[in-house]
């Protein structure tokens, strides 16, 4: 675990095999923030931004390669088919072939950049005796994380009055494999509210988040610990 003190609080980075858990603690104890990054990399770049530490996951090379391959494939299809002639007949315009290819490739490149998104980054912020805020960012691969958070972040706040409990629930997935996931029981809701629906932390990290969340939400039950073998 890597921990560092800032003027606004303490940031801890727990690097796991399949993900990275970032914990931001407010120096006054007003809130704590848990962010799960769906990549494991000890060479993160940390950028101090608006009272928090933004973690730059680095360039998603596999996503960029996918965008390039899609554009190359579309270019070959345009050259070997009568696609450009069909466009000329449809819109009754005559444009030089080179300009046609340039325009179409530009539009297709823009479309792939918009549609091919980076991995989801999920954050749970727990405010002292107030509630919890869930956020999810699935931004563009060419944008830095702080830009994606600004333009593509989806945020939901659940007040303390609506939260009945925070639990670690047991479930089954394909192949009858048992999984555990953090969820909030919300008043007047027929389903559990998953805290990390896309990125599933390990059971030990879930216990850590569970115990801290109950402390911040004024739950007095005994903290969870790893069962003895």
Swiss-Prot record:
Pathway per the UniProt entry: Glycolipid biosynthesis; glycosylphosphatidylinositol-anchor biosynthesis
Membrane-spanning ranges: 59-79, 101-121
Reaction equations catalysed: a 1,2-diacyl-sn-glycero-3-phospho-(1D-myo-inositol) + UDP-N-acetyl-alpha-D-glucosamine = a 6-(N-acetyl-alpha-D-glucosaminyl)-1-(1,2-diacyl-sn-glycero-3-phospho)-1D-myo-inositol + UDP + H(+)
Bilayer topology term: Multi-pass membrane protein
GO biological process: fungal-type cell wall organization; GPI anchor biosynthetic process
Functional description taken from the UniProt entry: Part of the complex catalyzing the transfer of N-acetylglucosamine from UDP-N-acetylglucosamine to phosphatidylinositol, the first step of GPI biosynthesis.
Assembly behavior: Component of the phosphatidylinositol N-acetylglucosaminyltransferase (GPI-GlcNAc transferase) complex composed of at least GPI1, GPI2, GPI3, GPI15, GPI19 and ERI1.
Entry similarity comment: Belongs to the PIGH family.
Protein name as annotated: Phosphatidylinositol N-acetylglucosaminyltransferase subunit GPI15
Record organism: Saccharomyces cerevisiae (strain ATCC 204508 / S288c)
Lineage, opening ranks: Eukaryota, Fungi, Dikarya, Ascomycota, Saccharomycotina
């Amino acid at each position: 675990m890597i921990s560092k003190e800032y003027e606004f609080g303490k940031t801890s980075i727990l690097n796991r095999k399949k993900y990275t858990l970032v914990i931001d603690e407010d120096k006054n104890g007003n809130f704590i923030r848990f962010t799960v990054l769906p990549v494991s990399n000890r060479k993160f770049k940390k950028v101090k931004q608006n009272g928090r530490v933004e973690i730059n996951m680095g360039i998603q090379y596999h996503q960029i390669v996918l965008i390039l391959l899609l554009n190359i494939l579309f270019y070959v299809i345009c050259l070997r088919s009568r696609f450009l002639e069909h466009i000329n007949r449809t819109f009754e315009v005559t444009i030089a072939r080179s300009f046609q290819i340039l325009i179409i490739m530009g539009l297709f490149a823009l479309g792939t950049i918009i549609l091919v998104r980076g991995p989801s980054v999920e954050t749970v912020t727990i405010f002292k005796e107030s509630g919890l805020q869930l956020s999810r960012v699935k931004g563009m691969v060419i944008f830095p994380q702080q830009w994606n958070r600004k333009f593509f972040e989806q945020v939901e706040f659940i007040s303390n009055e609506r939260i009945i409990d925070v639990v670690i629930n047991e479930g089954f997935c394909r192949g009858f494999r048992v999984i555990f996931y953090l969820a909030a029981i919300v008043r007047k809701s027929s389903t559990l509210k998953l805290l990390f629906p896309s990125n599933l932390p390990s059971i030990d990290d879930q216990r850590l988040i569970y115990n801290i969340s109950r402390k911040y939400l004024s739950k007095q039950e005994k903290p969870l610990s790893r069962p003895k073998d």
